[in-house]
């Protein structure tokens, strides 16, 4: 059973998503973004991109409401060249949550646009559909990445470590802006060894 603290945390997460949903639509409509969606990075070495990433910030969405903290993505090479995606986090009840899916590289030229699919989610379409995972920012040492989608309604700040340097955070914010998004739409993700609060990224100056 959920205790009162768990229920309060989940309710707070729901209210954040509801409050920001209109802001996301308004902000993306005002963004000075190139037509046809955000520009992916010129080239991704998929072998270097594989491994574990910590989610340090994200645009709230219904599918990640279950996660309270320590959200991570593990990417490994699967059969046929597709990527096996294992997302895990700690829920509001303090229990582990894991979902496993696959990612198919849609843009063979850059390898920066993929189509990610998870089981049990309706209306996803086939693996050869349009991309829904676009890498728009990537550290030269593959220490951080910024990911969105063609509509710019989702967004994730990923890091190899639980915390980023001030310089890397500046690079992350620039990548978000260059993608036609506002860093105020991103909320920091509580991470052991990193940021512990959930606040708009534009107010966090680590």
Predicted regions and their residues:
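A beta-rich soluble binding module of mature secreted/lumenal proteins
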Residues: 2-206
């Amino acid at each position: 059973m959920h205790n009162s603290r768990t229920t309060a945390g989940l309710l707070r997460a729901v209210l954040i998503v509801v409050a920001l949903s209109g802001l996301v639509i308004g902000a993306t409509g005002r963004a000075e973004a190139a037509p046809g969606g955000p520009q992916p990075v010129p080239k991704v070495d998929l072998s270097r991109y594989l491994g574990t990433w910590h989610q340090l910030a994200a645009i709230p969405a219904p599918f990640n409401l279950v996660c309270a903290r320590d959200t991570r993505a593990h990417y490994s090479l699967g059969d046929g060249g597709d990527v096996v995606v294992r997302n895990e986090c700690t829920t509001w009840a303090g229990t582990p949550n894991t979902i496993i899916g696959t990612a198919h590289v849609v843009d063979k030229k850059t390898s920066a646009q993929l189509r990610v699919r998870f089981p049990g989610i309706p209306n996803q379409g086939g693996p050869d559909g349009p991309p829904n995972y676009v890498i728009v920012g990537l550290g030269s040492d593959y220490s951080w990445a910024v990911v969105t989608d063609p509509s710019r309604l989702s967004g994730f700040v990923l890091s190899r470590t639980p915390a980023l340097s001030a310089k890397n955070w500046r690079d992350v914010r620039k990548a978000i802006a260059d993608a036609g998004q506002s860093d105020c739409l991103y909320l920091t993700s509580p991470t052991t060894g990193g940021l512990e609060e959930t606040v708009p990224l534009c107010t966090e100056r680590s």
